From Swiss-Prot:
The gene is nuoH. This is NADH-quinone oxidoreductase subunit H. It comes from Rhizobium rhizogenes (strain K84 / ATCC BAA-868). It catalyses: a quinone + NADH + 5 H(+)(in) = a quinol + NAD(+) + 4 H(+)(out). Keywords: Cell inner membrane, Cell membrane, Membrane, NAD, Quinone, Translocase, Transmembrane, Transmembrane helix, Ubiquinone. GO terms for cellular component: plasma membrane. Its EC number is 7.1.1.-.
């Protein structure tokens, strides 16, 4: 009995506790990321934004959560009830499950698997099914058109994201996310004789891929200017037209969880993860999770600024950018990076 407890039960309880702690912290972080998104957009438009619930509106997201939870869900008469209610659940569960392999500091990860980046690609590619299910089950033309747009958009830009990640993997030689971060302790800067700093991170040596990944992440998460699946001026609200109350909240939660995941992936792949910007003793005292969160928040700030300033693309422009610009550029960069690594032996 003691061996069973020590071998199976106790590790399982620890894993469950870690998962619950990560889930709570992630949901709170998403709540404030959502508030920051609204505040930034309001500031650009010279408005004050949410400022009533709590000091400076800090509890606005929790008030919205309570409002959504107490509302009655309305299911359209012609909808497939089971699939209609299952779709937002699928969306949010898949979006949250990818966080099991994301390291937020050295050793701070639930499952430090050797194929972590492959796991994230596999799970994130399934998230489109929640949108397709919601659009089809609504039995309405606008949700269905939004779901079709989302499927085409996510498939188009997943190819570019995959090729960008391949260029990073060529430089690192590992699919493990922790190894990808630690490999950025030395890079282009140190090879040129400079002290270890942010110049060693992949954003500089793979700058074109950094830009492609950032823009593709916007398209993958349906963020403006690529919010074609829920374009208000064209499709009213896209695949979420018929949703309200808790199901709508779950779709929104899944969307922002995917956005925060892409911000974290950008941090891990190109911005050194939890590494300090300069390797000096005073910055090394700062916990790695603080650096990770600051970098992820910076990437999200860029997401929010793009939302505020860049007008929405037309659908044909979106497809042209993905297939005629990003795909050839990503393929060319894979070949160029492989050639340079073979020639210089820097891998």
């Amino acid at each position: 009995m003691d061996s069973f407890v020590s071998t199976y039960l106790w590790p399982a309880l620890i894993m469950i506790g870690q998962s619950l702690l990560l889930l709570v912290c992630l949901l709170v972080f998403i709540a404030y990321i959502l508030l920051a998104d609204r505040k930034i957009w309001a500031a650009v438009q010279l408005r004050r934004g949410p400022n009533v619930v709590g000091p400076f509106g800090l509890f606005q997201s929790f008030a919205d959560l309570l409002k959504f939870m107490v509302k009655e869900p309305i299911i359209p008469a012609g909808a497939n009830k089971a699939v209609f209610l299952l779709a937002p659940l699928v969306s949010v569960v898949l979006a949250l499950s990818t966080w099991a392999v994301v390291p937020v500091a050295n050793g701070w990860v639930i499952a430090n698997i050797n194929v972590g980046i492959l796991y994230i690609l596999a799970i994130s590619s399934l998230e489109v099914y929640g949108i397709i299910m919601g659009g089809w089950a609504s039995n309405s033309k606008y949700p269905f058109l939004g779901a079709l747009r989302s499927a085409a958009q996510m498939v188009s830009y997943e190819v570019s994201i995959g090729l960008v990640i391949v260029t990073v993997l060529l430089c690192v030689g590992s699919l493990n996310l922790t190894d990808i971060v630690m490999s950025q302790q030395t890079g282009l800067g140190t090879k040129l004789g400079l002290p270890a700093s942010f110049l060693d991170w992949h954003w500089l040596s793979l700058f074109p891929m950094f830009i492609v990944f950032f823009i593709s992440a916007l398209a993958e998460t349906n963020r403006p200017p690529f919010d074609l699946p829920e374009a208000e001026s064209e499709l009213v609200a896209g695949f979420m037209v018929e949703y309200g109350s808790a199901p709508y909240m779950m779709f929104m939660l899944g969307e922002y969880a995917a956005v925060v995941l892409m911000c974290s992936l950008t941090t891990i792949l190109f911005l050194g993860g939890w590494l300090p910007p300069v390797d000096i003793w005073i910055l090394s005292w700062v916990p790695g999770i603080i650096w990770f969160m600051l970098k992820a928040c910076f990437v999200f700030f860029m997401f929010a600024m793009v939302k505020a300033f860049v007008p929405r693309y037309r659908y044909d422009q979106l497809m042209r950018l993905g297939w005629k610009v990003f795909l050839p550029l990503s393929l060319a960069m894979v070949v160029i990076v492989a050639f340079v690594l073979k020639l210089t032996g820097w891998a």
